[in-house]
Structures are given as C-alpha cells and as structure tokens.
C-alpha cells in the first residue's frame, strides 16, 4: 500500500475530512489533496504533522514494520475505539465468545 492510500484510509478511519486535515497541518486544501492523490509529497515537517493528525506513527504512515493485514487490523481497532462504551462491550463479548469457541474446537480436534 502506498503512502497516498494510507493517508486516505487512515483519515477516513478517524472520520476526518481532507479540509480538516489541511487545517490541522497548516497547509492548503489543494496541497493536502495532492498528497492523497500522489501528485505531491509532504515535507518531513508536514509528515510529522500528518502522522500526529492521523493519530499514528510516522513508521505506520510510511508502511514501515506494518503489513497491509496489520494496518487493516489497526484501522478496525481505531474504528472500534470511536464507538460508545456499550457498543465496545458488545464487540468485546462477541470476540471473547469466538476465541473460546476456537479454543474449544482446537482442543477437541487435537484430542480426538
């Protein structure tokens, strides 16, 4: 995944508009749109500001140490964090029951 795709995906995951990002970084909307379209690259200073605004590290933004699969998982976790407490508890309960089910199946399959 290219940086332009990570910019757009992460921005959408945290429910920010391109205009909000441009404002937080202190650049024009046109400049920010060029980053997401791949027509322009941010300066190092702006890269730091973008990572902060996107609530991720520069390494994550640049795709370092993160597989696409891990990045997708992180985006999902960040979306879950935006849910209210009751919705988060419901997801936690479903996840816990799936993990128990998986463990039980694993024990039964290896014990047979």
Curated annotation (Swiss-Prot):
GO MF terms, alphabetically ordered: DNA binding
DNA-binding region: 18-37
Alphabetically ordered keywords of this record: DNA-binding, Repressor, Transcription, Transcription regulation
Any single Pfam family the record assigns to this protein: HTH_3
InterPro entries: Cro/C1-type_HTH, Lambda_DNA-bd_dom_sf, RstR
SUPFAM superfamilies the UniProt entry points to: lambda repressor-like DNA-binding domains
HTH cro/C1-type domain mapped to chain residues: 7-61
Known role: Transcriptional repressor of the integrated CTXPhi phage gene rstA2.
Protein name: Cryptic phage CTXphi transcriptional repressor RstR
Organism, as annotated: Vibrio cholerae serotype O1 (strain ATCC 39315 / El Tor Inaba N16961)
Gene coding for it: rstR1
